[in-house]
């Protein structure tokens, strides 16, 4: 940092000639502001940066993370970027007309000053804003998430990206597009929006609107689904959810939520065990998840479901690692609709089985381990298929798409971890033809890719380390010999062939590819060897439908 000196000799150029008369005024005002610092404020550091910015004619001023409660009224007039995020600011002074980027996230702002006419980026998330001033026509990106905003001003035609998640918006702004070629992505998730204006259809089909977790009426949902399903539809892609946006944030004690799944004669002992986990990370959201799980169609209609959940909870109580993993998986499950809870339950059952495999449950049952691996492989392929399907839909709840493929193909693909019923299949956009195509694709890819996938699967490696220590050690030795002797030349050859020699990013990518190919070769050879031995002993088969 340059030394600050009030006797600094100003160069003879146009800028400094302009400010020479006010140079002392800036310093005097800033020094006075510094002396008014509250305990904990780093105003001395802020003033040092202000003076350096002025002396150097810098176009950027960064005063973030200094615990400031206010800013001086006279900011350097030449700046184009101002970063004052992560302070304690309740208001901002008049902003320089030259400003193009304003970062003031995570403060306590209740209002904003008049915005500069050339502003391009406004980042004021995590404040206490209730409204916004008029937005300049130049604005390209804006993040106002996590505020208390009830309505929005007119949106500039230039605006490409808007994030307004978690506010109190009751309606969307009017959308006008015309011949404007801008590709837009707007996020209005988790507000209080109950209807969608017809002007949303003015947006181009390359645009995306996110309105998940809002109390949209069933009439609004049906109307949108009807419009966006039309062959003539050319409007934006709309991401929604079947959630009403009104999930209860209250939760009961974890032990109470757990014991509700057990018979009365076991509840006292179970409660005592789970009381010890009340303060673990995500315990509160896990409690809420268990209560929501009890209200799913699977819980109501599936025989033995309560016993299945109770047995799973017993396993969680006995393993801190599994419990930690499961709490994390369930962390966001209650922020959306019932089918989000059902999909999370699927993922929790996968987590349990993979954990058990890694811990040795299938060390002596290779056939069962192969069956589990095959199920995990099929689920991965279904996720790929669901992801591709989402891209084709104009009005989409992603949760419903992912769950639809798992639920509707659970029996045909022998998916033991998938629920057999879901509530909102009708809005998923997944057709009978989609399901037939997905089943065929899963079986085709399984036939051609499963053994390679299985040879790289973490739980299989854990089994090999425990039960085939000598073979595993030999495979590791072969891998590192190959990497030491062949890796550099193979990477160099790949870069030369693509004309990217000397490109650091390309070298990293090529290195990762060579590493994966090496591991694939070594571990596939080891897998074939071990499976041939084990499957011949017990009569199991590697391939089956």
Curated annotation (Swiss-Prot):
The keyword Transcription does not apply. It holds the Pfam family NEL. Ubiquitinated in the presence of host E1 ubiquitin-activating enzyme, E2 ubiquitin-conjugating enzyme and ubiquitin. It catalyses: S-ubiquitinyl-[E2 ubiquitin-conjugating enzyme]-L-cysteine + [acceptor protein]-L-lysine = [E2 ubiquitin-conjugating enzyme]-L-cysteine + N(6)-ubiquitinyl-[acceptor protein]-L-lysine. GO terms for biological process: protein K27-linked ubiquitination; protein K48-linked ubiquitination; symbiont-mediated suppression of host innate immune response. Residues 1-242 are annotated as: Interaction with target proteins. It is found in: Secreted; Host cytoplasm; Host nucleus. Residues 251-545 are annotated as: E3 ubiquitin-protein ligase catalytic domain. One of its GO terms (cellular component) is host cell cytosol. Belongs to the LRR-containing bacterial E3 ligase family. Also interacts with human and mouse U2AF1 (U2AF35). This is E3 ubiquitin-protein ligase ipaH9.8. It comes from Shigella boydii serotype 4 (strain Sb227). The lineage of its organism: Bacteria, Pseudomonadati, Pseudomonadota, Gammaproteobacteria, Enterobacterales.
